[in-house]
Amino acid sequence: AGKLSLHDPVSKYIPEMAKVEYLTGDSPTINIENLLTMTAGFPEDNPWGDRQLHEPDEMLIGLIDQGVSFSNAPSYKFEYSNTGYALLGNIVSRVSGMPYQQYIKTNILQPLGMDNTYWEYDNVPAAELAIGYRWEDEQWTLEPMLHDGAYGAMGGLLTSIEDFSKYVRFHLSAWPPRSDADTGPVKRSSLREMQTPKFPRLYAKAKDSNGDPCAVMSGYGYGLGIAENCNGRKGISHGGALPGFGSNYIFYPEYGIGIMAFGNRTYTGPLPSREIEKLLFETAELKTRELPVSDILAERQEQVLRMLQTWDVALEKEIVAENLYLDESRGQRMTHAQEVFEKAGEIQKVEALVSENQLRGTFKVQAVNGSIDVYFTLTPEKTPKVQDLRFRF
């Protein structure tokens, strides 16, 4: 850990990369982040890359040494590249002094308790090994297994749903940001960085699971796809496939859940996951998990409610930011509050605060004649004060 920077040129670790001829004369040098985000300019290579899984490091470095073809200039746009991730695996091996497979096993898989996860199918207990198939000539045909090699860094793990759920759970544990002990094996802030899209793209004509128009913003982080649909629901996912197999997983940080599906047919699609999503979000109407309420937000909630009822000058001096009465006069706010609380009638219950973040939230005041919705947000000062306050009956 800490032995490289994402902005280091790849040639610092793989000298053969210094000789590559870029597509354009103004191309920037490929760095490690380019490989992670699929923006190195390499062409999409899924069909070809799958068949390179077993090849040794010498083949990978020979490919670079002989010269590679580019489809784009680096840092210009996203294009999926298995070769880029094979190079990342090679860098991990060189920097760590051990095969990337061993480094990942020791530093990621074992700490997560993923003891039933393998790189090489020969090491999987025979009774547990899933056999791959393809559909050909109207019948199922066995697909020969591929051995592990240099290209395994693109996604050559063999695992179970139970084991892989530990990995997905680890990603979900990064949310929300908090001050709890950070036990690793990767820092929560680093996981959230992995889940942040680069080069986001708008799919304006996208449709939802029912075929209705629903635009999607989509991008790629560090080995993860991130998409947010027209309903504001963000999913972080990746699919993968090799001859004989297919997999798909997605997790929703704001909901605290993950969905995964594995299949032993060549390029199995994500349909099972999509059906589960429909059940959760449309049928069950799953709600987002609530953010914890900060101490200052909880304190200001009680004070805001008291101010709206009493307009105590001393209290206002304590909690009102300098802009609040400049944006709308104290007199206007007082008159509006009196009208709202008179219409609502006697207060019966104040509901729990729902926080948008550590300095902004909403709550409902239940009264005899209905409810009052209250929204407020606090300043960035050391002692945060109320800079915006809205309420309606």
Annotated model-derived regions:
Residues 243-246, 370-372:
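Short, small/polar residue-rich loop motifs at catalytic or cofactor-binding pockets
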Residues 215, 335-381, 386-388:
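Surface-exposed, charged secondary-structure patches
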Residues 22-236, 241:
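Short, surface-exposed loop or secondary-structure junction motifs
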Residues 237, 248-251, 255-265, 373-375, ...:
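Short, well-ordered beta-strand elements
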Residues 282-288, 381-393:
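A short, surface-exposed interaction/processing loop segment used at functional sites
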Residues 199, 206-208, 233, 261-332:
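Short, gly/Ser/Thr-rich active-site loops of penicillin-recognizing serine hydrolases
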Residues 1-10, 88-93, 256:
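Active-site SXXK
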Residues 5-23, 112:
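Short, glycine/proline-biased beta-turn/loop segments that scaffold the active-site neighborhood
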